[in-house]
Amino acid sequence: MLVQFAQLAAAFAGARFGIDRPSVGLLSIGEESSKGNPLVKETHELLAASDMNFFGNVEGRDLIPAPVDVIVTDGFTGNVALKTLEGAFKFVFNTVLKVIDTNDETRAAGQALFPYLIPEATLLTPEHQGGAMLLGLNGICAVSYTHLTLPTIYSV
């Protein structure tokens, strides 16, 4: 099952982003091929034997920035990974805002930094990255947040 996900995602990355021979990583609990549950171990063997540009296992700490073009995983694990990243980004952003609002010096520093931080931070918001393509269906389908605007949905 995950091998087909990898094939679809690599084909999509090539077509959508113009990546020649996209590199594919398998999300696991360690870089070693011996780590992971039975599905991950079996998928690792199959991807390693395939003609795909298989990088090997990648860990959760490697999701951003990723050392590969495509990271493949099952839906449950992928959802947990994405929600964890979302929570971590929210925590870091709110912590930075809290620190900036500590005193006059930090507020002044914040005013100097905000023009540079805000454009980067908005790249991670649902309004900018509102969803993802759902591959493997007989048609086009995007999974997204329910409160998005039409321009955001179009950008998916």
Where in this protein do the model-derived segments appear?
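Short, catalytically relevant binding-site loops at active-site mouths
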Residues: 32-33, 60-64, 77-79
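Glycine-rich phosphate/nucleotide-binding loop
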Residues: 67-71, 76-148
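Flexible, glycine/charged-enriched surface loops at secondary-structure junctions
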Residues: 16-24, 51-61, 102-111, 126-132
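Alpha-helical scaffold segments in soluble metabolic enzymes
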Residues: 4-15, 42, 46, 83, ...
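Glycine-rich phosphate/diphosphate-binding loop of Rossmann-like nucleotide-binding domains
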Residues: 2-57
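Single conserved hydrophobic/aromatic residue that forms the stacking wall/gate
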Residues: 147-155
